[in-house]
Amino acid sequence: MSNRVEIRRLITGIPGFDELLGGGVPEFSFNVIAGTPGSGKTTLAHQMMFAMANPSQRALFFTVLGEPPLKMLRYQQQFSFFDFEKIDQSIRFVNLASDMVDGDFDRVLARSNDHGADSLQHFVQQLGMHMTSWQATTFLIGEYLQPEEEAGPVFTVADGIIWLSQLVRGDSMVRKMQIVKMRGMSHKLGTHTFRMSGNGIEVFRRAVFQESDVPRPQYGVHERLSLGVPALDEMLCGGLPAGYSLLVVGPSGSGKTMLTTEFLEEGQRRGEPGVIAAFEKSPNQLLSNRLNALVESGAVGVINTRTLDLSIDEILHDLVAMIEKMKAKRVVIDSLSGFELALSSIFRDNFREALYRLVAILTGMGTTVLMTAELEDRYTVLQFSSYGNAFLADAIIMQRYVELDGQMKRVVSVVKVRGSDHSKDVRFFDIEGGTITVGRRLSGYSGILSGQPVRGGHASVRRRKKLSLGR
């Protein structure tokens, strides 16, 4: 028989926060919510209090030298979680400011005891020693400018430390949360993004792939997905392997978005729902083309990417939620350049690492991911991604322009497919009637990737001959 004490976890009801804590707040724990002014400390405390308080588990909110209760309530009631019916029934607000100004701490302690030990929330370090006997789950809210102040005596006494901060770079601001410690809980490490809206706080856990995080569809060993363009499937030796990530690179107007549309339409024909995060266009622009029919039919879900100062964690959260809702097998991110611009500047320095985590999680779910990237066509320099992210993709398809007989032509080639054979041809392609048509292979030319193919022998040999004649 085990004598181990089981710690009850109190569910806060804040989206993403309980997961961060490791399942909720430990009952009867003494916690500190710390951070800079305006970082969301009071809102976090109120949102938890309104979610957890009930007639059998009442809550007390003591104010000391901060905002007066009336002023604080005036602003907090703007949030949707604020429930007027709980005031004085399940929640009571007590102002201790006058007692503190008079310097009579004994009166403060006496008044706290008068309000009942079972629902006490404490606010100073000296009261921490009484927590166990009072059996109160307590949150102390304090303003601290530097994380180094966590070494103070209040933090030593605390069972849990929740640190909130605001990161500012230029005109961009991002809110971050860190569970510094939470005794008895397996909490998530690192800093995590959160947002405040009319509904209160929503936490977006830092994206780290774990096999157990999401269900993974089962595919056959050799199962492949059609791109919706038969000739491209042929160049891929039967289509793109299921669960792969594909990077489609090309200059502006080369047909990258058109290929994503073909990819999603093929999914609809095969009963494979899709999800698209379109950073190049607003939802209105996106839904004005062929994708509108896919969305209205329920075959494709659209992620709202128009919010400013996004984080990778927010985008991944929305993608995973939509994938699970749609039971999607195909995911499109159009494009990586637009994706980077949608991010807060604070996250752009780590864009490569963040993209790696995102792709790993999405493909780990068993979805097949198609990403597009703008190719700066310098012709003489072959660069598949301006971010150095080409290695993240399992397969790469390159689209380019070439000047041939005084005309700009489109060509396409399969650069790589990890662990699979593929065509090495460079083939003409065109867009006719809103459909991609892949034509014949370029034969009899050299220097194709330079953008200025030369009919016949090697361009380098011809140049050497011209130089020798010039002598």
Q: Residue locations for each model-derived region?
A:
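Conserved P-loop NTPase
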Residues: 2-3, 7, 166-226, 324-330, ...
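Pre-Walker A adenine-sensing motif
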Residues: 12-24, 228-239
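Scaffold/interface architecture of coatomer-like assemblies
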Residues: 22, 30-37, 44, 48, ...
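Short glycine-/polar-rich loops that comprise or flank the Walker A/P-loop
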Residues: 28, 55-58, 88-91, 134-136, ...
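P-loop NTPase motor core
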Residues: 31, 106-157, 161, 311-396, ...
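Conserved P-loop
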Residues: 36-100, 105, 242-247, 251-314
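Conserved nucleotide-binding/hydrolysis micro-motifs of P-loop NTPases
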Residues: 39, 65-70, 97-102, 138, ...
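Extended interfacial segments that mediate partner engagement and assembly in macromolecular machines
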Residues: 217-229, 234, 241-249, 257, ...
